[in-house]
Amino acid sequence: MGPVMLDVVGHELDAEEREILDHPLVGGVILFSRNFDDPAQLRELVRQIRQAARHPLLVTVDQEGGRVQRFHQGFTRLPAAQSYAALNTPQEAQRLALEGGWLMACEMIAMDIDLSFAPVLDLGHGSAAIGERAFHREAESAIPLAQAFIDGMHQAGMKATGKHFPGHGKVSADSHKETPIDARPLVQIVEHDMVIFRTLNACGKLDAVMPAHVIYSQADSRPASGSPYWLQQVLRQTLGFEGVVFSDDLSMNGAAVMGSYAQRAQASLDAGCDMVLVCNNRQGAISVLDHLSAAGSPRIARLRHRGQVDREGLMGSARWKQAHQDLQRLHQRWEEAKQA
């Protein structure tokens, strides 16, 4: 599979998109809310994407739950990660997290979507970019919830992507708008933020990792997403991670310090990413395809979904009905708690 993941504009493909998707460097597509009208339309769009590519690619989405859920009508309203621990006993929180990962993955696989970029492994709720997307502020409480969520995804046949390595939760700035700088001592990041990544990787739960567009100034002057130190020395060598490394979206302002779109993509791949995301800027994506010097990684193909999910059969199953009811209720309780 090629090393570039990009987006499409609407509910169906246009002629230029069909041509772009057939480019040998394109290995994936990420979908957004603007691509969704209803489940039938979404399933047809995914079919068009796979047909246009004429080579294997990943179809992906951010369907985390809470404020980051791209598809709503016809899908379960998933609770925010923070709500699992905030409103339940530890045992019930883990049960619900497992069902949340399973149900989310099943609903996406029924659309022939390979991957939802989840779960968020950042610690703490103070970051503008993270907030309720994090399970907990402490690793010892977040780890069992993240592990349960991943176990649910794996039961459904979907691989898990931990984000945003080595941890985005302690910077208040939003990397969508600027490049955050985390000036904490390196030992603090290693012994706090990275614990969840290290633990989940050691027990074989992480299939992919997405680094942060954050500069950890005590370690490197480059964002982690373009840093050989973080991706090769720490992630690959020290942690022994063998899965796929995705860049976060290179159109985010947090990546702008790496140069033009083509320079950002090349820097990320040279640093150790297997695949780069270039979203919401057609000319930027074309520039990357025109100038990139890179081959696809064989690791990427491992992330294709392995599930066989019929949507009607899924929604008729006892497990889906119970999980749907429990998760919708948790979502509603969380929204009410935030208003209190």
Swiss-Prot record:
Active site residues according to the UniProt entry: 176 (proton donor/acceptor), 248 (nucleophile)
UniProt keywords, alphabetically: Cell cycle, Cell division, Cell shape, Cell wall biogenesis/degradation, Cytoplasm, Glycosidase, Hydrolase, Peptidoglycan synthesis
Enzyme class of the recorded protein, top EC level: hydrolase
Main location: cytoplasm
TM segment ranges: none
Subcellular compartments: Cytoplasm
Tree of life domain: Bacteria
Pathway the protein acts in: Cell wall biogenesis; peptidoglycan recycling
Pfam families: Glyco_hydro_3 (PF00933)
Example GO BP: cell division
Reaction catalysed by this enzyme: Hydrolysis of terminal non-reducing N-acetyl-D-hexosamine residues in N-acetyl-beta-D-hexosaminides
GO molecular function terms noted in the UniProt entry: beta-N-acetylhexosaminidase activity
Binding-site list for substrate: 62, 70, 133, 163-164
Site (Important for catalytic activity) location in chain: 174
Similarity comment text for this entry: Belongs to the glycosyl hydrolase 3 family. NagZ subfamily.
Function per UniProt: Plays a role in peptidoglycan recycling by cleaving the terminal beta-1,4-linked N-acetylglucosamine (GlcNAc) from peptide-linked peptidoglycan fragments, giving rise to free GlcNAc, anhydro-N-acetylmuramic acid and anhydro-N-acetylmuramic acid-linked peptides.
Name of the protein in question: Beta-hexosaminidase
Organism: Edwardsiella ictaluri (strain 93-146)
Classification of source organism: Bacteria, Pseudomonadati, Pseudomonadota, Gammaproteobacteria, Enterobacterales
Underlying gene: nagZ
